[in-house]
Amino acid sequence: MSHNQQAAQPSSSRTQVIEREASPGVLTVRGAAEDEDSNVRFTEEVVDNEHMDKKKSKICCIYHPPAEFGESSEEESCGSDDSGPESDEGDIPNARKPKKKNKGKCGGHRDPSPNAYERKPRPKKN
């Protein structure tokens, strides 16, 4: 049994690497074509809420002007001097107690009037 074997001849292959300078890409962005007839149109059944005394948005914060220097938010009402039986002055013997300036006299100070969102709406007269 004779077996003929052929010797594998090495094949020659070449890899050639070509380096090119990378040019910066330019991306041009264009907006969509403007539609000349892009006005909003309403049908007859749409209700106009203007001038109907309806609130149009939710308000998260209501601005109250800052108190004058030296005033605190605890000194709110006229006539409260905290000298009644509900006073907690005897509860904590060594605690610092704030001095109360308000001795039942309103010195021309009054609470700010509520703004439009704090006021209850008046019923309409028909």
UniProtKB/Swiss-Prot annotation:
GO terms for cellular component: nucleus; protein phosphatase type 1 complex. Its main location: nucleus. Pfam families: PPI_Ypi1. Residues 38-53, 108-120 have a biased composition (Basic and acidic residues). Residues 1-16 have a biased composition (Polar residues). GO terms for molecular function: protein phosphatase 1 binding; protein phosphatase activator activity; protein serine/threonine phosphatase inhibitor activity. Belongs to the YPI1 family. This is Type 1 phosphatases regulator YPI1. It comes from Yarrowia lipolytica (strain CLIB 122 / E 150). The lineage of its organism: Eukaryota, Fungi, Dikarya, Ascomycota, Saccharomycotina. The gene is YPI1.
